[in-house]
Swiss-Prot record:
Detected in sperm flagella (at protein level). Self-associates. Associates with microtubules and forms a fibrillar structure partially linked to the microtubule network. Interacts through its C-terminus with PLK1. Interacts with ODF1. Interacts with MARK4; the interaction is required for localization of ODF2 to centrioles. Interacts with TSSK4. Interacts with AKNA. Interacts with QRICH2. Interacts with CFAP58. Interacts with BBOF1. Interacts with CCDC38. Interacts with CCDC42. This is Outer dense fiber protein 2. Keywords: Cell projection, Cilium, Coiled coil, Cytoplasm, Cytoskeleton, Developmental protein, Differentiation, Flagellum, Microtubule, Phosphoprotein, Spermatogenesis. Its main location: cytoplasm. It comes from Mesocricetus auratus (Golden hamster). It comes from the Eukaryota.
Amino acid sequence: RTLRDLLREQHSKEDSERLMEQQGALLKRLAEADSEKARLLLLLQDKDKEVEELLQEIQCEKAQAKTASELSKSMESMRGHLQAQLRCKEAENSRLCMQIKNLERSGNQHKAEVEAIMEQLKEL
């Protein structure tokens, strides 16, 4: 064997070892990348679940806000209706008070007239 053959063989062996080391390093990096991918997939699933829960909360809050808005509108309508009824009752109350005062005044006038007539009858 010649020195050249031995050197070529040595270089080939070193190249082979270097390639094996590189392959090992690449396999290690691939395993780490696969592990990171699995971790990120789990994290993504957790985040997707969290997003779904938040969307459900938002839908629930929207429904509650809609219900509250409808209730508020209903209460405002009822308030307006009750205020109108109150104004009508106050007007009726005022009218009845005036009638009572007029009846009292009329009654007092009739009483005075009766007393005057009674005085006239006594004089006869």
